[in-house]
């Protein structure tokens, strides 16, 4: 199963995106067919450094990255699995192979403060927030479990 997160609003305090599920992948041309909107997302702000330190230097240095406020994870394609989160005491999707990050989860929450560096799902009906987050998290987990049950890998592409 392919998930696509398209960032549509990059603000100082948050990033809003649209999460879509790909119904069909054209293997010959490696293109997506039948992209279906699923829900909205909320993340920390996208990283845009305006200092003498380059973005590449920060991404190479875990110490520098930890000293910054939480920021949105880099664009890319990441494997998604569901695992137990001791912090949230729940089974939640987690992204694997994110450069410089570990424990990036998709979880419930409403505001940028709730993201804790992760991705929140819901409906963006208020500025800078997502609503009905638990409902959309449940729906997403169901889709992931169904895909895994069919023997499919689950991938999230962030762009």
Describe every region a protein language model picked out.
Residues 1-154:
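Cell wall/extracellular polymer interaction/catalysis modules
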Residues 155-159:
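Low-complexity intrinsically disordered segments
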